[in-house]
């Protein structure tokens, strides 16, 4: 049975528009509380990012959980990975994150997970949706008796505990003293976390986009808009810059020359360091969109590489299947399962800084050995909803075969349908940009002929 409200990243949408309304949030909290209580859950921990709508949704979910007889612990604005960690630390039975990650302020979302940081299983989500439908359509939300109502407490030392956890990831024989770092917190959940972590480890920190006002989260800043970070690194003559997104589950770097170091390059740095330190377990998991340059660079170090479907959840699945520890996406979702159960921007950044210090090189130098291949990406708009038919056609398959023959071992071809628009995305990457462009245009022409 397919899920009605829960997507791959919980429930998400435009604030004030169903399902991101206070009524829906309260009834979702109640339904989740009923299902979780049936498995022995006594307390749920709630964290959020810095969107103004977070207060409204937090209060609504809190009311629903309390009505179901579940206690609530509030930790305020906190990175998504911090909520996963703190749910376990504070002995809560489950966690809730109120965030829409890198989306604009007018969006928000609600995500539930266990105290081990994993999302609820499909059966639990279906049970929650069944109760939620009753509450929405038949006003069937029943409140427990007064003496059984859930109690609510606010935890004031959550940030300090998470900061100490992050610092514990960093090698105890190293210090960031002597490094000048620019940190862009995207006016998001890490604004009071990330700068303090680096400062307490000895770095000189220039903090930008660290004054959230409820509407400026991800607004031309953070991991998805690196211009201001690049400028700040150059102006302050910093050693490097670090940018996170609104809920701090993805990270990007800028080197001292102002050049972007993306998720694929971060994976290379972590894998190279693990290989040199003798801590490498298996290989690295990327995605279908990971740059071929990463695969080539890892192969040169005899490090295996696998591609998962696009999406950090699929990277996690592949890591668990293989028993490998390092994986991620070019967008900056970086996983190192030896240190965190989910993508954690602060933890990943510390592992990169540790690798840089251990190498004795600058960030620019350590990443220079990985040569990213130029990618050509063409979006072919369809006149009908027939992407699957086109991708399965003999003509398109033949065009791909011909392109791969031309590229040989120097490139690759990837065709994907968009999950949100009537598009087929044609991606070609190779050592020869002109060849990539020509092959991408040829395949796009074949796709357009349908």
Swiss-Prot record:
GO terms for cellular component: cytosol. Belongs to the phosphohexose mutase family. The active site is at residue 101. Activated by phosphorylation. Keywords: Isomerase, Magnesium, Metal-binding, Phosphoprotein. CDD domains: GlmM. One of its GO terms (biological process) is peptidoglycan biosynthetic process. The gene is glmM2. Its EC number is 5.4.2.10. SUPFAM superfamilies: Phosphoglucomutase, C-terminal domain, Phosphoglucomutase, first 3 domains. It comes from Shewanella frigidimarina (strain NCIMB 400). This is Phosphoglucosamine mutase 2. Mg(2+) binds at residues 101, 245, 247, 249. It is an enzyme of class 5 (isomerase). Binds 1 Mg(2+) ion per subunit. PANTHER family: PHOSPHOGLUCOMUTASE (ALPHA-D-GLUCOSE-1,6-BISPHOSPHATE-DEPENDENT), PHOSPHOHEXOSE MUTASE. Its cofactor is Mg(2+). The keyword Acyltransferase does not apply. It catalyses: alpha-D-glucosamine 1-phosphate = D-glucosamine 6-phosphate. GO terms for molecular function: magnesium ion binding; phosphoglucosamine mutase activity; phosphomannomutase activity. NCBIfam families: glmM, PRK10887.1. The modification Phosphoserine is found at residue 101. Catalyzes the conversion of glucosamine-6-phosphate to glucosamine-1-phosphate. InterPro entries: A-D-PHexomutase_a/b/a-I, A-D-PHexomutase_a/b/a-I/II/III, A-D-PHexomutase_a/b/a-II, A-D-PHexomutase_a/b/a-III, A-D-PHexomutase_C, A-D-PHexomutase_C_sf, A-D-PHexomutase_CS, Alpha-D-phosphohexomutase_SF. Pfam families: PGM_PMM_I, PGM_PMM_II, PGM_PMM_III, PGM_PMM_IV.
């Amino acid at each position: 049975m397919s899920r009605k409200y829960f997507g791959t990243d919980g429930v998400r949408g435009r604030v004030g528009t169903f399902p991101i309304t206070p009524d829906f949030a309260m009834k979702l909290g109640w339904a989740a509380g009923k299902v979780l209580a049936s498995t022995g859950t006594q307390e749920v921990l709630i964290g959020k990012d810095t969107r103004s709508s977070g207060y409204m949704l937090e209060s609504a979910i809190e009311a629903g959980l309390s009505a179901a007889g579940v206690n609530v612990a509030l930790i305020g604005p906190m990175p998504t990975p911090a909520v996963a960690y703190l749910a376990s630390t504070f002995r809560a039975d489950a966690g809730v994150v109120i965030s829409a990650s890198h989306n604009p302020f007018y969006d928000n979302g609600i995500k539930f997970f266990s105290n081990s940081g994993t999302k609820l299983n499909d059966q639990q989500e279906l049970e929650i949706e069944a109760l939620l439908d009753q509450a929405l359509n038949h006003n069937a939300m029943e409140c427990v008796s007064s003496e059984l109502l859930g109690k609510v407490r606010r935890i004031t030392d959550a940030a300090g505990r998470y900061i100490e956890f992050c610092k514990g990831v960093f090698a105890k024989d190293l210090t960031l003293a002597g490094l000048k770092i620019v940190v862009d917190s995207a006016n998001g959940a890490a604004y009071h976390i990330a700068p303090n972590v680096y400062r307490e480890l000895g770095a000189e920190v220039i903090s930008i986009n660290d004054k959230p006002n409820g509407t400026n989260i991800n607004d031309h800043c953070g991991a998805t808009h690196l211009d201001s970070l690049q400028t700040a690194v150059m102006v302050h003559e910093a050693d490097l810059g670090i940018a996170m997104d609104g809920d701090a589950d993805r990270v990007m770097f800028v080197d001292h020359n102002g050049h972007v170091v993306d998720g694929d390059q971060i994976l290379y740095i972590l894998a190279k360091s693990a290989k040199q330190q003798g801590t490498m377990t298996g290989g690295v998991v990327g995605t279908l969109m990971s740059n071929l340059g990463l695969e080539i660079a890892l192969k040169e170090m005899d490090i295996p590489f696998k591609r998962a479907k696009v999406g950090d959840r699929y990277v996690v699945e592949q890591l668990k299947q293989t028993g490998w520890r390092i994986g991620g996406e070019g967008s900056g979702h970086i996983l190192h399962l030896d240190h965190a159960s989910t993508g954690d921007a602060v933890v990943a950044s510390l592992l990169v800084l540790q690798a840089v210090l251990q190498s004795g090189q600058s960030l620019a130098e350590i990443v220079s050995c990985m040569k990213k291949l130029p990618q050509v990406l063409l979006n072919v708009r369809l006149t009908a909803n027939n992407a699957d038919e086109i991708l399965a056609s003999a003509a398109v398959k033949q065009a791909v075969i011909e392109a791969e023959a031309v590229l040989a071992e120097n490139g690759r071809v990837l065709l994907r349908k968009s999950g949100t628009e009537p598009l087929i995305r044609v991606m070609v990457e190779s050592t020869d940009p002109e060849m990539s462009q020509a092959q991408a245009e040829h395949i796009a022409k074949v796709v357009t002929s349908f």
